[in-house]
Amino acid sequence: MMKEETPRANRFHIGLFGRRNSGKSSLVNMLTGQQVAVVSDVPGTTTDVVLKNIELPGVGASVLVDTAGYDDEGELGGLRVKQTVNAARRVDLALIIVSGLPDGAEKEKAWAERFRADDIPVLYIYNKVDEDGGSHADAWRMTLGATEVVSVSARTGEGRDRLLSAMAEVYRRTDEVEELT
């Protein structure tokens, strides 16, 4: 079945979650090879959940779910976070995007716990490796207590193949569990 023929509900949903300006929308653009999401240096550019159908190697027909930052503020920010929470309930894989130095990873840990409580696998993605050579990825890994943090640059495409491989591995594990039940 071609990706255009696969109903959206039957696709593998991959959610991108993180703080404002962590590069979620830029990652959507990098993964699709298209400018489908608006990006800027202004925090809070993504105001609504954006869905993008994509065919991923090793996964097949999928949907990328781009969300507003979970640290958004103010009255409108609260509404955007509510949409992000609703989107989180409908994903099959959560990518938690981080960048820069770990500045109190409480939000990231809380979101990871939320996903795990719902049996949703989590991949930590360190974005903007082009800005610091990835020197902070290990600090994030240790702070989060993660076995792995996939380092990427949405701007240059560095790490794209590793990210695709990591997502395909999670998909395979998820698919194996579904076949057993």
Predicted regions and their residues:
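Canonical P-loop GTPase G-domain recognition
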Residues: 120-123, 128-181
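Short alpha-helical
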Residues: 22, 45, 103, 132, ...
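A short hydrophobic beta-strand->loop->alpha-helix junction that borders the nucleotide-binding pocket
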Residues: 41-42, 67-68, 99-100, 152-155
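Conserved Switch II/interswitch segment of TRAFAC-class P-loop GTPases
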Residues: 72-73, 88-109, 119-135, 155
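Conserved G1/Walker A P-loop phosphate-binding module
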Residues: 1-78, 83-88, 174-181
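Hydrophobic beta-strand core positions in alpha/beta domains
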Residues: 16, 64, 97, 124-126, ...
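Solvent-exposed alpha-helical segments within well-ordered globular domains of core cellular machineries
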Residues: 29, 52, 62, 82-89, ...
